[in-house]
């Protein structure tokens, strides 16, 4: 029996199926269905939402540390020093 060359071994290992976490379908559904992250921390986490239509006019539905809430979602103002 001939010894196996390192190149043959590398070829076999590269062709072996690699484990994959989740599926692309789950990733895209999560991206489409979940609102974007909030740009600033919400003042109060008492107005929850699942869609933009559930929030009053000036507020936006976004994902924060306390859940998916309606907030002003304004970008934080950086002070110049």
Swiss-Prot record:
Protein name as it appears in the record: WAP four-disulfide core domain protein 13
GO CC, one annotated term: extracellular region
Alphabetized UniProt keyword annotations: Disulfide bond, Protease inhibitor, Secreted, Serine protease inhibitor, Signal
Subcellular localization: Secreted
UniProt domain WAP: residue ranges: 31-74
Species classification: Eukaryota, Metazoa, Chordata, Craniata, Vertebrata
Coiled-coil portions: none
N-terminal signal peptide: 1-22
Predominant location category: secreted
Record carries keyword Protein biosynthesis: no
UniProt-recorded Gene Ontology molecular function terms: serine-type endopeptidase inhibitor activity
Function: Putative acid-stable proteinase inhibitor.
Species of the source: Mus musculus
Domain of life: Eukaryota
Positions of disulphide bridges: 38-62, 45-66, 49-61, 55-70
